[in-house]
Swiss-Prot record:
PANTHER family: PHOSPHORIBOSYLFORMYLGLYCINAMIDINE SYNTHASE SUBUNIT PURL. This is Phosphoribosylformylglycinamidine synthase subunit PurL. GO terms for molecular function: ATP binding; magnesium ion binding; phosphoribosylformylglycinamidine synthase activity. It comes from Methanothermobacter marburgensis (strain ATCC BAA-927 / DSM 2133 / JCM 14651 / NBRC 100331 / OCM 82 / Marburg). Mg(2+) 1 binds at E78, N512. Its EC number is 6.3.5.3. Part of the phosphoribosylformylglycinamidine synthase complex involved in the purines biosynthetic pathway. Catalyzes the ATP-dependent conversion of formylglycinamide ribonucleotide (FGAR) and glutamine to yield formylglycinamidine ribonucleotide (FGAM) and glutamate. The FGAM synthase complex is composed of three subunits. PurQ produces an ammonia molecule by converting glutamine to glutamate. PurL transfers the ammonia molecule to FGAR to form FGAM in an ATP-dependent manner. Monomer. Part of the FGAM synthase complex composed of 1 PurL, 1 PurQ and 2 PurS subunits. ATP binds at Y37, D474, G511. Its main location: cytoplasm.
Length: 714
């Protein structure tokens, strides 16, 4: 049980009595960090959540934002870190299942999945095992339910060796007049439970996710990992949409963490209503299940529909059509109480608000020691450094991952994995760019700046496709919030993210917090995973690859002597230290807005765009050459900024920078850019040249490809 002594005392005072064992179990689940957000809620208030086009913000199963006059997009993101550490294949697969149900609950058809994954270095056998089976779990589940996995990111670092991070984002489309909510507003309506049968898997899943892992977790906590079934999920999806199309439902919610206890209490508490639940009506997968097990089970592929009693027969007929178990398991009441009955007796009677809205905890925050200066190193040859960066699993091609995913099912994917963002077709004219990004090293060494920079990088990725950000979702992965240094990291990171979002006027419409990512005293690098959706006309998509020889290369944004916390230091020198790049909120916005303006004004004259992030300008230009097979000549002295040597010029990770190629006259474009910028080179030839240093594009290609494949074949 994760209830603290003070929480138990609070509960006794609210009830005027001691809870019985079932009630204790229900309260334990709902007071868990995973369900209650009791530590994070005060901090999450920093986020801007309202803005043009926002239909539903935080607080429901997913956020919803307007995309066209008729269509909206539901977007959510979730973590499945602890389950994936224990059972990587099943943990990752059920993570996909959970986020799909969140999108379906809004009435939206899922059209895209994205994943953000973090593991230990691939030299470690256990890390390779976790990586292999997490990717297979994602691909098997996503491919079988027919939802494309279109983009993502992967990071490898020692701090994720014992505690991998598995975050999944999903986007879906829904007509604006068909959006559903997770509410139960009408007393007298009934709860229709449909989908998978309820078993013993996943019991205590949310409390398991609200504690640190230990050396014995792999054995002791395996029953807390849910068991997914993608075939049943496919049937649940189809049946759900048919029910929502044919029957007026007043509320829809999936059964995820906390099972029936969480789902029903949240449905009714939002409307100040109550619920009566009959355990005998619930379709079970196993015999002899206790009320405690039934109410806390997190068995997968289950949905609750709130509807009028006179529409039950129609809904049941649809469920029979798809061979799905279904039953009316209770009703909405006006009592404000969550009542559970078994064999005609009341066995639990709790205020719904007490379950769904536990009190917050004001955590202590303490600033840890952080680096204040740059790290002095002896720089190797430029060619050696660039090739080593390109052959690092953190930068090298992720083709081993995305080739396992079906990214073209549904035939919406316009720009496929491997670019700055994926682009999907919404209608004949409109597309959405989707990305997910994070910089855990910057956040570890400067939480405020790293949080802001993670939002900035995600926005740069959609801007580089020709889109403008509509909304942000986030998945915040941190250690134990009871430790003051960890909570300070979390608070400062959220402040930085919120400030960057506010600068762009881009609302945060949904999110997830995953605490307790610690094992045996090793805390993960704080990882604020940021998903961004941007809208763009389908006829103005940009991609990163060079398009032709003889085009001018422009850099937007200043490059500074900021090698601290860089991929260059981590990969080439084995150092994770130094002050990360500064975050200039206004400069980040001005650079993005300048890119938007020149795309709008000059259109096809802008032939390629790529953001600068891990590895700096050197890696960014190399990736553009590798993607196209076209070389380039770069004059590093023309790069705008204040660096002191070529390694700083090429590998600093200063924020707010883009690389563009343009055709025709460049002067007019430069004049339009009211930010630091310069023409730094020209495309052409079979080599990438930085001043008098040259590398054949074929050599860059070979360094960049086959890296992860080589590790995974050992």
């Amino acid at each position: 049980m994760v209830l603290t002594d003070s929480e138990i005392e609070f509960i006794r005072k609210e009830l005027g009595r001691d809870p019985n064992p079932l009630e204790y179990g229900m309260l334990d689940v709902m007071f868990s960090e995973h369900c209650s957000y009791k530590s994070s809620r005060p901090v999450l208030g920093f986020f801007p959540t309202e803005g043009e086009g926002v239909i539903i913000g935080p607080g429901d199963d997913a956020g919803v934002v307007e995309v066209t006059d008729e269509l909206a997009m539901a977007i959510g993101i979730e973590s499945h870190n602890h389950p994936s550490a224990i059972e990587p294949y099943g943990g990752a697969g059920t993570g996909i299942g959970g986020i799909l149900r969140d999108i379906i609950s809004m009435g939206a058809m899922p059209i895209a999945l994205l994943d953000s994954l973090r593991f230990g270095y691939l030299e470690d056998q256990k890390s390779r095992y976790l990586f292999e089976h997490v990717v297979k779990g994602i691909s098997d589940y996503g491919n079988r339910v027919g939802v494309p996995t279109v983009a993502g990111e992967v990071e490898f670092d020692d701090n994720f060796q014992l505690n991998p991070l598995v975050n999944v984002m999903c986007a879906g489309l829904v007509r604006k007049d068909e959006i559903k909510r997770g509410i139960a507003p009408r007393p007298g309506d009934v709860f229709l439970l449909m989908g998978g049968r309820t078993g013993r898997d996943g019991i205590h899943g949310v409390t398991f996710a609200s504690e640190e892992l230990t050396s014995s977790s792999e054995l002791e906590d395996r029953p807390a990992v849910q068991v997914g079934d993608p075939f049943t999920k496919k049937m649940v999806m189809e049946a759900s949409f048919e029910i929502m199309e044919k029957i007026e439902v007043s509320g829809v919610k999936d059964l995820g963490g906390g099972g029936l206890t969480c789902c029903i209490s949240e449905l009714v508490a939002k409307c100040d209503n109550g619920a009566r639940v009959n355990l005998e009506a619930i379709p079970l997968r196993e015999e002899g299940m206790t009320p405690y097990e039934i109410m806390l089970s997190e068995s997968q592929e289950r949905m609750i529909f709130v509807l009028s009693p006179d529409r039950v027969d129609e809904a049941m007929e649809i469920c029979r059509k798809y061979e799905l178990p279904a039953a009316v398991i209770g009703e909405v009441t006006d009592t404000g109480r969550m009542i559970v009955e078994s064999e005609g007796k009341v066995i639990a009677d709790l205020p719904a608000k007490l379950l769904a809205d536990p009190p917050v905890i004001e955590r202590e925050a303490k600033k840890p020691d952080l680096p204040e200066g740059q790290v002095e190193v002896q720089h190797p040859l430029l060619t050696e450094a660039l090739l080593k960066l390109l052959s690092s699993p953190n930068i090298a091609s992720k083709r081993w991952v995305y080739r396992q995913y079906d990214h073209e099912v549904q035939i919406r994917t316009v720009v496929k994995p491997g670019d700055d963002a994926a682009v999907l077709r919404v209608d004949e004219k409109t597309g959405v760019a989707l990305t997910v990004d994070c910089n855990s090293i910057h956040t570890k060494l400067d939480p405020y700046g790293g949080g802001a920079a993670s939002v900035g990088e995600a926005i740069r990725n959609v801007v580089s496709m020709g889109a403008w950000p509509l909304c942000i979702v986030d998945c915040l992965n941190f250690g134990n919030p009871e430790k003051p240094e960890v909570f300070w990291q979390f608070r400062e990171c959220v402040r930085g993210m919120a400030d960057m979002a506010e600068t762009f006027g881009t609302p945060v419409i949904s999110g997830n917090v995953s605490f307790y990512n610690e094992t045996e005293g090793v805390t993960v690098n704080p990882s604020p995973v940021v998903g961004v959706a941007g809208r763009l006309p389908l006829d103005s998509i940009k991609t990163m690859d060079f398009k032709a020889e003889g085009e001018k290369i422009i850099v937007i944004g200043d490059t500074k002597p900021e090698l601290g916390a860089s991929e260059y230091l981590r990969t080439v020198h084995g150092i994770v230290d130094g002050k990360p790049p500064e975050t200039d909120l206004r400069a980040e916005f001005d650079a993005a807005n300048s890119v938007r303006r020149i795309i709008e004004r000059f259109g096809d004259k802008v032939t390629a765009i790529h953001d600068c992030s891990a590895g700096g300008i050197g890696v960014a230009v190399a990736e553009m050459a590798i993607k196209s097979g076209i070389g380039a000549t770069i004059d590093t002295g023309k790069i705008p900024g204040s660096f002191s040597n070529i390694h700083e010029a090429l590998f600093s990770e200063s924020n707010g920078r883009y690389i563009l190629t343009v055709t025709g006259s460049v002067e007019e474009i430069i004049q339009e850019l009211e930010v630091p910028c310069a023409v730094i080179g020209t495309t052409g030839g079979g080599a990438l040249k930085f001043d008098d240093v040259a590398l054949d594009v074929s050599e860059l290609y070979d360094a960049y490809h086959g890296v992860i494949e080589a590790y995974m074949s050992t």
